[in-house]
Amino acid sequence: MTNVTGTERVKRGMAEMQKGGVIMDVINAEQAKIAEEAGAVAIMALERVPADIRAAGGVSRMADPTIVEEVMGAVSIPVMAKCRIGHLVEARVLESLGVDYIDESEVLTPADEVYHLNKRDYTVPFVCGCRDIGEAARRIAEGASMLRTKGEPGTGNIVEAVRHMRQVNAEIRQVASLREDELMTYAKNTGAPYEVLLEIKRLGRLPVVNFAAGGVATPADAALMMQLGADGVFVGSGIFKSENPAKFARAIVEATTHYEDYELIASLSKGLGNAMKGIEISTLLPEQRMQERGW
């Protein structure tokens, strides 16, 4: 049987449709409905949010297909699901379920320590994490249709997402300023495919959308990432590990849309209750840092 793949233009266009919005992690139909009612543009179906994955330890895998199908049946907005890095079969299973996007995610335990998926072989568009332009360009070359900062998932700490967004944007500006003869050396030094760097130089930006993810816990966090140039926001544990998930969800959506309206953000932040409990990044051991997964 011949695989039918979606064209790059179509898949990137699907990702562009989520621009300016919030994508929320959910673990059941009830949470999915809360996210949809709050104004999420899409949801990520999981067995456990990143904070619980971090706390549980062990090996984290693709969600039970029953959960994915339950969530898909509960909402009308697009549904994403995560597969392990390099896990060909998990990705094919999710594609067969009819999910709208697959996240080849460092939040799950990698299945392959050498190869990421060839995402061009799939009809469904893929989302991938990145910390710098080298990682971003490699994922794009593999066929990713959407990027997100890795941040440090499940911590409720925005500092790593900020670092990664600033790093990528600074390197985009650097690439745009280079002559084409200088670009080959830059490609060699960063491990970024030359053809992708040429496209970035021509456009003056990444050729796919880049969302913020990994540590967004408050409306102000979401607005901050939008001001730093994010095309939208993923919220993993920040919604359903907060004291009032429905209120936090609505507030984060509003703050993402109106990220320069400080009076509104102040109003949205009043009386929300406690945000999720955060983790100081310096307390994490190297093997606990999910952002280090992927290559």
UniProtKB/Swiss-Prot annotation:
D-ribose 5-phosphate binds at residues 25, 154, 215, 236-237. The keyword Lyase applies. Pfam families: SOR_SNZ. It is an enzyme of class 4 (lyase). Gene3D superfamilies: Aldolase class I. The keyword Phosphoprotein does not apply. Keywords: Lyase, Pyridoxal phosphate, Schiff base. It catalyses: aldehydo-D-ribose 5-phosphate + D-glyceraldehyde 3-phosphate + L-glutamine = pyridoxal 5'-phosphate + L-glutamate + phosphate + 3 H2O + H(+). Its EC number is 4.3.3.6. D-glyceraldehyde 3-phosphate binds at residue 166. Catalyzes the formation of pyridoxal 5'-phosphate from ribose 5-phosphate (RBP), glyceraldehyde 3-phosphate (G3P) and ammonia. The ammonia is provided by the PdxT subunit. Can also use ribulose 5-phosphate and dihydroxyacetone phosphate as substrates, resulting from enzyme-catalyzed isomerization of RBP and G3P, respectively. NCBIfam families: PRK04180.1, pyridoxal 5'-phosphate synthase lyase subunit PdxS. Belongs to the PdxS/SNZ family. This is Pyridoxal 5'-phosphate synthase subunit PdxS. It comes from Bacillus anthracis. The gene is pdxS.
